[in-house]
Design a protein with these regions (language model features):
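Short coil/turn segments that connect the beta-strands within blades of beta-propeller domains
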Residues: 35-37, 75-77, 119-121
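A flexible loop/linker signature enriched in serine peptidases of the S9 family
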Residues: 21-24, 42-48, 56, 61-67, ...
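Periplasmic/extracellular electron-transfer cofactor-ligation site
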Residues: 51
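Positively charged n-region of N-terminal signal peptides that target proteins for export
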Residues: 1-5
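Short N-terminal segments immediately surrounding and downstream of signal-peptide cleavage
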Residues: 22-36
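Cleavable N-terminal signal peptides
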Residues: 7-8, 18
Length: 144
């Protein structure tokens, strides 16, 4: 297990270094799959997946809006993420292989997924105050 974690840390550093040539601040919000075989991450406002062994990352979201905060479902088949697609930050799900995202929340505030429970329910925070666009720390938020 220790070797796998060291390998994972090395891959994240190499991946970050590769993307750092564009902008060191674009690679964000990574999440390791339940089986430890893949990493979902945000890069330039879209969600990507890469094997922990390395290789080419595959883009699973494509949208002019900013997609962020990827989380894996417990079975590893679905990615839960937040997106600013409808003028507020809502929660979506998409198959890990890619496909059409499905909107799960539609509140006027900003929702951020925090964890996905074994039964598939999502714990998220919701902010009724507008934070700075794409901010990481919403003001006035509550956990649901």
């Amino acid at each position: 297990m220790k070797n796998k974690l060291m390998t994972l840390a090395a891959i994240l550093m190499v991946t970050a270094s590769a993307f750092a040539q564009d902008s060191p601040l674009w690679l964000r919000k990574n999440s390791i799959s339940p089986d430890g075989e893949q990493i979902a991450f945000t890069y330039k406002g879209n969600i990507y997946i890469v094997d922990t062994d390395g290789g080419l990352a595959r883009q699973i979201t494509t949208n002019p809006a900013y997609d962020t905060d990827p989380l894996w479902s417990p079975d590893g088949k679905t990615i839960i993420f937040a997106s600013y697609r409808n003028k507020s930050k809502d929660i979506y799900k998409i198959p890990a292989e890619g496909g059409a995202p499905v909107r799960l929340t539609s509140h006027p505030g900003n929702e951020t997924p925090m964890t996905v429970l074994e039964d598939g329910n999502i714990i998220f925070s919701a902010s009724i105050q507008q934070d700075a666009q794409y901010g990481d720390f919403p003001g006035g938020s509550q956990v649901y």
